[in-house]
Amino acid sequence: MANHILYATDKNYCELCAVSLYSLLSNLHGEVVIHIIESSLEERKDDLIKIAKMFNKEIDFIPIEDISRRLVEADIPPYRGGYSPYARFFISDYVDDGRVLYLDCDTIIKGDVAPLINYDLNGCPLGAVIDQSSSHVNVLIGHHQHDRYYNSGILLFDVAKCRETDVPERFLEAVKTIDLSNTFLGADQEIMNVAYYHQIATLPQSANMMFTIRFFEPSQIWSVSSKGPSDYYTKEEFIASKNNPLIIHFAGGGRYQPWREEGIYYMDEDADLWFDTYEKLYPDGRYDVAKLKKIMNERKKHSFFKTAGTFPGLYCSLKGLYRGLKLLPKRIRARRAFKSGSSASSGD
């Protein structure tokens, strides 16, 4: 039974995808099949093929048009101009069996992902890492405040279970209940948490270590986000993951990404690893590594940048409350209707 790696990218994110792919294959032990859902990659496709060949691998490119067509037929509107954010949830239509590890392009891998791919999902169709965002987001999407809310940047799919529970169809049903112009933390993430409510296994936090939380203590996260060990991670799990992360996820937009001049990111070993990998692959690339390193090192001298990175939970809470309160009654009715329909279907 084969195991699989999945990315989704276009020509604008190709260089980020290349860095992640190179770091993945540099650390990988064992055989995997690599799939990339591509949108308008054109000649940039050769960048990724070249990296795969360095490690005697091939890439199965899946045109986004195949998935887009299905979404258009279901009257699903695009999100931010396209359908790429949704594509990962249709991978069971393209893979016969085994496990699929999906990775966002804004990641860098620091170890062998083989043990993660074989992680026990407890019968669930997919696994994810709990997001650090405020528990109030749960209320705003019609869930209980202390339900677990998951990040969609790194996902582990069990293909057989995806087919058994019809993951693509549940996604299509859920997206119809959501106003895509007013999502709190990204349409794909919100849809995932609604569509697979109580069907997502919790992965170790080390599988998706975000810059936005690495300077928190567990008690700070629990305080700022109104979470606790029951709907987040224990103190021991949190510290172990911070000390030995498997996958670094530069989530949070330009503020938390080392390749962006704007924002608050400052130099650390993960930024250094990203820059070194990028320079190796793109010595004349679009990012000026020397300039970026200088900016990051300057930021490191100022405590503000260290402090500013520790408030994403509060930021997400305020953002979610501001954007969501107006739509709260409508959202709760839609979610209850969706969950009621799902329960009726499962009882047939």
Pin down the residues of each PLM region.
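A glycosyltransferase accessory/donor-loop signature
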Residues: 1-3, 9, 164, 168-348
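N-proximal low-complexity "stem/linker" segments adjacent to membrane-targeting elements
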Residues: 1-22
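Short, acidic, metal-binding catalytic loop of nucleotide-sugar glycosyltransferases
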Residues: 23-31
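Short internal beta-strands
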Residues: 33-39, 128-129
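Active-site-proximal specificity loops/subdomain of glycosyltransferases
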Residues: 44, 52-93
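Short aromatic/hydrophobic "clamp" motif used to bind/position activated sugar donors
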Residues: 100
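Conserved donor-nucleotide/metal-binding helix-loop-beta segment in metal-dependent transferases, i.e.
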Residues: 107-141
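Short glycine- and hydrophobic/aromatic-rich loop-to-beta-strand nucleating segment
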Residues: 153-162
